[in-house]
Amino acid sequence: MLLVIDVGNSNIVLGIYDNERLVRDWRVSTDKSKTPDEYGILVHDLFRLAGIGFSDIKDIIISSVVPTLTGALEKLSRQYFGFKPYVVGPGIKTGMPIQYDNPKEVGADRIVNAVAGFEKHHCALIIVDFGTATTFDYVNKRGEYCGGAIAPGLMISMEALFQKASKLPRVEIAKPPAIIAKNTVNSMQAGIYYGYVGLVDGIVTRMKGEGKDNPRVIATGGLAGLIAPESATIEEVDEYLTLEGLRILYQRNRET
């Protein structure tokens, strides 16, 4: 079995593949203060509840945007599983040309998503990933990563509103009953929710106009399912896109 690990700023998503089949997945909070041993205990407990042993895992691949945790998880792999993991970054073969001023600047998660999306659809794509930051990535019809845009995530936007406006409460991110809201909580939700739908559709529309490839628009990330129903541009939500991309990259690098 293959263990894939996607380390984001807010969450770590783990998945276990048996060949091409995702058999289990978990989402846990990112904690930069945890040691390799503490993450080892966490993984052990998740595995135990799923009836999986460390010895069942034959390889590991990691995508991380948190450098301090990359090292911790590499150490976890060596100590608890007995081998060095694959880490998405320099030296990993993606099979995708990266048209970026400095390809090393592109977040690992963005490349993983692009690889998975093109492998699945074989057409031009815009991939919207709703994470701590929301990223918009453009892949052309030739399968080349062309770049994209980065915007503050929904949680960051809501937290900034709470912290900077002293009379406004912290509220749940949710679709409000109406855009013309009748109370403060719903008013904040309306501004954040519909403002974000407008942000997504606005950026996607501009990218479509600039790219001229008639791309398919895919959303992923924890809050994709909340925004997609009101979006005029998102065509598909794929919650496992990043995990699938890690599996594909593992296959490409194992075979070389």
UniProtKB/Swiss-Prot annotation:
Reaction catalysis annotation: (R)-pantothenate + ATP = (R)-4'-phosphopantothenate + ADP + H(+)
Residues that bind ATP: 6-13, 132
Binding site for K(+): 129
Named cofactor requirement(s): NH4(+); K(+)
GO cellular component: cytoplasm
SUPFAM superfamilies listed in its UniProt record: Actin-like ATPase domain (SSF53067)
GO biological process: coenzyme A biosynthetic process
InterPro entries named in the record: ATPase_NBD (IPR043129), Type_III_PanK (IPR004619)
GO molecular function: ATP binding; metal ion binding; pantothenate kinase activity
Subcellular location: Cytoplasm
Pfam families: Pan_kinase
Catalytic center residues: 109 (proton acceptor)
Annotated residues for binding of substrate: 100, 107-110, 184
Keywords: ATP-binding, Coenzyme A biosynthesis, Cytoplasm, Kinase, Metal-binding, Nucleotide-binding, Potassium, Transferase
EC number: 2.7.1.33
Keyword Endoplasmic reticulum on entry: no
Cofactor binding note of this UniProt entry: A monovalent cation. Ammonium or potassium.
Keyword Metal-binding among record annotations: yes
Pathway given in the UniProt record: Cofactor biosynthesis; coenzyme A biosynthesis; CoA from (R)-pantothenate: step 1/5
NCBIfam families reported in the protein's UniProt record: baf, PRK13318.1-5, PRK13318.1-6, PRK13321.1
Subunit description: Homodimer.
Main function: Catalyzes the phosphorylation of pantothenate (Pan), the first step in CoA biosynthesis.
Similarity section: Belongs to the type III pantothenate kinase family.
Name recorded for this polypeptide: Type III pantothenate kinase
Gene: coaX
